[in-house]
Curated annotation (Swiss-Prot):
GO terms for cellular component: cytoplasm. The keyword Cell membrane does not apply. GO terms for biological process: protein secretion by the type III secretion system. It comes from the Bacteria. Chaperone for the type III secretion of Tir. Probably stabilizes the protein, prevents inappropriate protein-proteininteractions and aids in secretion. Coiled coil: none annotated. Belongs to the CesT/SycH chaperone family. It comes from Citrobacter freundii. This is Tir chaperone. Its main location: cytoplasm. Pfam families: CesT. Keywords: Chaperone, Cytoplasm, Virulence.
């Protein structure tokens, strides 16, 4: 029997016209949007799934990085956006958004993925303007249009 996350993922794949996508044996489904944004979905349990945006590796040589990350995390949470978190295996900064599975539609999933993508863009640009660069093979500052963001935006 398929979980609610699996059924939603099937409907989402059909909606966006990509055939089939599925969770792997670790209950993760990862994909790249526009060859820039690396997104992972986690089938955590039958109540919610997690949407992760992989922002890049922690820059260990910038003393302001930790303060900027704390500031960004507070800003995102105050505005209903994703949490910032650390993934130790890849030594990377992630944006994580909890997505409840009650009354879900593929459109709602798409909207929440967009919230994570917009938050990734904004975080990347604000950090870049502070002289902080996250090492990320997918996301390049030149590929994201900017109006010199100086403040965080939760993407909603």
């Amino acid at each position: 029997m398929s979980s609610r996350s699996e059924l939603l993922l099937e409907r989402f794949a059909e909606k966006i016209g990509i055939g089939t996508i599925s969770f792997n044996e670790n209950r993760l489904c990862s994909f790249v949007i526009d060859e820039i944004y690396y997104i992972s979905l986690s089938d955590t349990n039958d109540e919610y799934m997690m949407i992760y945006g992989v922002c890049g590796k922690f820059p260990t040589d910038n003393p302001n990085f930790a303060l900027e990350i704390l500031n960004a995390n507070l800003w995102f949470r105050e505005n209903g956006g994703p949490y910032l978190c650390y993934e130790s295996g890849a030594q990377s900064l992630l944006l994580a958004l909890r997505f409840p599975l009650d009354d879900v539609t593929p459109e709602k999933l798409e909207n929440e993925i967009e919230v994570v993508v917009k938050s990734m863009e904004n975080l990347y640009l604000v950090l870049h303007n502070q002289g902080i660069t996250l090492e990320n093979e997918h996301m390049k500052i030149e590929e994201i249009s900017s109006n010199d963001n100086k403040h965080y935006y939760a993407g909603r």
